[in-house]
């Protein structure tokens, strides 16, 4: 018997479409062996309408991305405390590290494992940070 999968498109999150067709799932919940594994697609600093929050402001972008991850997890019945792994993509590592305290506001003492990678560009040129999250409940 295969794992049960549930795709979630939270109302609070913007999702890219081609016409009326959604191009990806914001959240995928996979139930395996009595646990719910929650995969949150890379969150960018978009608001629910698709506008970039914090143009040119890494700190504001990190805050918006954190809110988006929180909203995605809540839609799946989880919290930020359930995150076990994040992958962060940034366009300027030095600038990102100046604002680590903003990222830390979203986590309790049980910090998730984390990978941070600098990239040349994200999906839109004004985006400075994108974070994927993996949670287990």
Language-model features: locations:
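N-terminal presequence-like segments and the immediate start of the first folded domain
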Residues: 1-67, 71-84, 90-137
């Amino acid at each position: 018997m295969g794992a049960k999968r549930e795709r979630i498109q939270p109302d609070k999150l913007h999702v890219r479409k081609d016409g009326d067709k959604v191009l990806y799932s914001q959240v995928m919940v996979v139930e395996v062996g009595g646990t719910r594994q929650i995969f949150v697609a890379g969150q960018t600093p978009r608001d629910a309408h698709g506008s970039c929050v914090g143009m040119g402001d890494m700190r504001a972008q990190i805050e918006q991305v954190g809110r988006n991850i929180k909203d995605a997890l809540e839609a799946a019945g989880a919290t930020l405390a359930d995150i076990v792994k994040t992958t962060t993509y940034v366009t300027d590592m030095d600038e990102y590290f100046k604002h680590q305290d903003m990222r830390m506001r979203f986590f309790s003492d049980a910090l998730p494992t984390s990978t941070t990678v600098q990239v040349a560009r994200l999906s839109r040129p004004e985006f400075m940070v994108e974070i994927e999250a993996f949670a287990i409940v």
